[in-house]
Amino acid sequence: MPNTLNTAAEQARDALANLAAGKLDFKIDSLMRYAPNSMLSKEAAVLVLFGVLDDEPSASADFQGCPDYVGENLDVLLLVRAGTLRSHAGQPAFPGGKIDPEDYELARQQGVPVGRIAALREAVEETGLDPAGVEILGELPTLPLAVSDFRVTPVLGWWASPTRVGVVDTNESALIARVPVRDLLNPANRHTAYVKRGRITHKTPAFE
């Protein structure tokens, strides 16, 4: 009898690799309309790390609106930023942060994009994960984060050998969690929040 968990994991990993390689449609026009990258001065990278839950499946296991490769055990690593931070306090986020000068030199030495170096370094610092178990699949297009003056590169990763993670520094993070992807895709858990900054009100995705 085939191992359906391994098969689903392989399908998910292959789909993510195709996304990173530009073989799947990925529309970001709506995310680019607020500020072009040329107007922003700082660079950052985040690690979008997918894996397979070790213990319990998604609470949305019965939700039928997912692609076949999004099994009930597929998860993504997220954190909640500390409430005392100057920017994006208390917000959920991917592990990551500003690209440091030494990241550029290390990227040059290894012959890889600098976003990979920075995203993995920050993820280790924030969550304590073992980088040896992470397979970097590639990068998605750099996105503007005008509110904090950053150009952010999402780095796609596959957690081939998951390790224990948790809050490393309470001044940086309040929570580290592996969140089932099906829960994020389930419309019952998805909402729209309205954030007002000055005279402008922005719509943003929100999750229950």
Predicted feature locations:
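N-terminal leader/linker segments that precede catalytic domains of diphosphate-processing enzymes
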Residues: 1-94, 98-165, 182, 187-208
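Short, conserved loop/helix-junction motifs that constitute active-site signature segments
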Residues: 170-171
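Conserved cytochrome P450 K-helix/beta-meander segment immediately N-terminal to the heme-binding cysteine loop
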Residues: 176-178
